[in-house]
C-alpha cells in the first residue's frame, strides 16, 4: 500500500539510448607513465574492443581464453608467471557492451622487471596475431568454455545477471541452450582471423604506474 501510494501514479515512457561518439584505437602506440612511490608497477596494455552484439564475440572468447583468460593454461600466464616469475597474476579480457568496450592485459610486477614484462606482453600479442592458435589450444578452450558454462550461473544473482544480459543484448531466451553449440562450431581459421582483425599491439595504449626511475620500458 505504501509503495502504491508513493509510486502508483508513475507512468512508463519510452527512453532512447544516449548517442555516444565512436571510439577507435590510436593510429600508433600510446605510452602513459605515472610516477608513484611503489615497490610494484601496475601495467595495463589495451585497445578498443568490440560491441557485444558483434557476431565475432564467441571466436574472441576462445581467443582470449588461449591468450590470457584461461588461467594457468593461458600463454601469458605460462610465459610471465610460470617461466619468468615476473608476476603472480596476469590476465587478458575483452569487456564488450552496447558499444565497443575495452580489451586489456593487466598485471603487477616489480619496477625492475616492468619493462621486460611489457615487452613480453607485446610479443605474445604479436605472436598470436601472426601465428594464431593450435588445434590443441582450440580443443582445450572449447572444452572449458562449454563445460564451465553452467557453473557460471549457479546462484540467483548470477542467473539474474545472465537474464539481464540476454535482454540487453538481444541474445534470445534460448541462449543458454545454444551457447555450447556456438562455441563448438568455431574453427581455428575463425579464431586466427579474429586475432589478426582485432589485436594490434602497435596501436595499443600502454599504461605503467610505478617508480619510474626504476622502470626501463622497451620504447
Give the ranges of each region predicted by the language model.
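Extracellular/periplasmic catalytic domains that process cell-envelope and extracellular macromolecules
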Residues: 36-38, 198-201
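Short beta-alpha junctions and helix-cap segments that line functional grooves
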Residues: 18-19, 31, 62, 92, ...
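Short conserved micro-motifs at the rims of enzyme active sites and ligand-binding pockets
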Residues: 54-58, 116-118, 156-157, 217-219
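Active/ligand-binding-proximal structured segments within catalytic/core domains
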Residues: 55-67, 75-78
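An aromatic/glycine/proline-enriched structural segment found at the starts
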Residues: 1-53, 208-219
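M16 family metallopeptidases and their MPP-like homologs
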Residues: 41-50, 64, 77-185, 201-210
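A short, acidic, amphipathic alpha-helical segment used as a generic capping/interface helix at domain edges
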Residues: 187-193
